[in-house]
């Protein structure tokens, strides 16, 4: 970024708040030796943060550690370390970055060593790799492990039997393990209070995501959206901090709508909205800003994305319900995006295309992420057929810098935007 653009960098109150929250959680994690707090490692989809807080345990999420290392340009060497130790090139790079991080002293972003987990909680919501990842972690740390088995929505619906099965596991396996490891007795009223906070924050998050229906969209629901979902999908859902963060964020977006502004980018306000896109798949983290710049330089705004639903489909009506504490945790896990079948995913993308008046669909296929990438070409063709809008396919990776080609992605995006322009011209001639 040039010196001329530096003064335009915008730091809003919500950004500062989120940065403080993340830094505070890492300080809490790396300070558990002094505080005596217990640590549980879990994953983002199906993350039961409200339940974890009931036992005064600190939540550590290995994916977010890999993302942090990716954005700090540190994951490449960690991945190569893991491959030298025998992990295949095809294995999820989150896993390899985590394994490599452990081999390098398991240093957190604050420069201090991460603690060993006292417990592993695997909420299985459709990603088979998570199971193998936790087998590696269990072998490394030899700590108590509990798996919450979440039935797959093969038929595209959640049944009473599925819900009852998850609640039964929570009562008979998960909660007793938490009590045993933490030494804290489960208090369902405490859980209810956290769930109330969650529902309030979820309302504001959904409002923010749906603000992209405006023209111009005041947000980028993919590149900006990954920041907006951060507190909700990680160690903060259910906290007063999350409620405050989403309240601040909503207020800022309301102001942008009043002023007719587009999204904030790393180089200031986006000046012109030329293309409205729906994006399927996670972003590339190692070249995140470079990747984003390829979009906003062309006036392309992502108005809806599937990745920002990986930790919960709140915009489809789900809210945590304090009146049914364990049942609502089951519903949450069952409804995560990666636990939906392909027809459900296609229907969601089609809905986004229509509701957000998108010009087209873009799929960012991740080389090492099978839970997202499987079936994406099929999904792309189906969306083209249903909507008549152009779709495109690019390939990158999560946190492996070897699989981000700036020139290749740039060429594909430029060709795609030309295709969108041609489609618009054809539509204009047809109606003339």
Swiss-Prot record:
Keywords: Aromatic hydrocarbons catabolism, ATP-binding, Flavoprotein, Iron, Iron-sulfur, Metal-binding, Nucleotide-binding, Oxidoreductase
Enzyme type, top EC level: oxidoreductase
Cofactor(s) listed: iron-sulfur cluster; an oxidized flavin
pH dependence of function: Optimum pH is 7.2-7.5.
Listed Pfam families: HGD-D
Stored PANTHER family: 2-HYDROXYGLUTARYL-COA DEHYDRATASE, D-COMPONENT-RELATED (PTHR30548), SUBUNIT OF OXYGEN-SENSITIVE 2-HYDROXYISOCAPROYL-COA DEHYDRATASE (PTHR30548:SF4)
Name the UniProt record assigns to this protein: Benzoyl-CoA reductase subunit B
């Amino acid at each position: 970024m040039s010196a001329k653009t530096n003064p335009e960098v915008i730091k809003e109150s919500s950004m500062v708040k989120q940065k403080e929250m993340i830094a505070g959680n890492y300080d809490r994690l790396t300070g558990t030796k002094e505080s005596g707090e217990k640590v549980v490692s879990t994953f983002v989809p199906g993350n039961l943060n409200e339940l974890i807080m009931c036992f005064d345990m600190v939540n550590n999420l290995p994916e977010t550690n890999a993302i942090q290392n990716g954005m700090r340009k540190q994951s490449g060497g960690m991945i190569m370390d893991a491959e030298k130790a025998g992990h295949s090139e095809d294995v999820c790079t989150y896993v390899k970055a985590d394994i490599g991080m452990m081999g390098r002293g398991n240093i957190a972003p604050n420069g201090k060593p991460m603690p060993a987990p006292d417990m592993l909680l695997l909420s299985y919501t459709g990603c088979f790799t998570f199971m193998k990842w936790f087998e590696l972690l269990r072998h490394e740390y030899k700590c108590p492990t509990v798996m919450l088995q979440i039935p797959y929505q093969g038929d595209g619906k959640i049944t009473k039997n599925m819900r009852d099965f998850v609640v039964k596991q929570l009562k008979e396996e998960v909660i007793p393990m938490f009590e045993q490891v933490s030494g804290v007795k489960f208090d369902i009223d405490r859980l209810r209070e956290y769930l109330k906070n969650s529902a309030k924050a979820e309302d504001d998050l959904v409002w923010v995501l749906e603000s992209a229906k405006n023209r111009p969209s005041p947000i980028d629901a993919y590149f900006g959206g990954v920041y907006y979902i951060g507190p909700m999908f990680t160690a903060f859902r259910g906290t007063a901090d999350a409620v405050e963060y989403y309240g601040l964020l909503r207020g800022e977006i309301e102001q942008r709508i009043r002023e007719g502004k587009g999204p904030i980018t790393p180089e200031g306000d986006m000046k012109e909205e030329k293309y409205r896109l729906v994006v399927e798949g996670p972003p590339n983290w190692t070249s995140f800003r470079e990747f984003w710049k390829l979009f906003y330089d062309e006036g392309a705004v992502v108005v809806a994305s599937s990745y920002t639903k990986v930790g919960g489909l709140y915009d489809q009506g789900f809210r945590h319900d304090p009146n049914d504490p364990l049942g609502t945790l089951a519903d949450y896990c069952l409804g995560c995006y990666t636990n939906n079948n392909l027809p459900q995913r296609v229907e969601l993308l089609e809905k986004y295309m229509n509701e957000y008046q998108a010009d087209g669909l873009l799929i960012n296929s991740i080389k090492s992420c099978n839970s997202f990438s499987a079936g994406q070409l099929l999904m792309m063709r189906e969306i083209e057929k249903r909507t008549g809008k152009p779709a495109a396919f690019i390939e990158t990776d999560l946190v492996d810098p070897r699989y981000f080609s700036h020139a290749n992605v740039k060429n594909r995006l430029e060709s795609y935007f030309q295709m969108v322009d041609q489609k618009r011209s054809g539509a204009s001639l047809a109606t003339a």
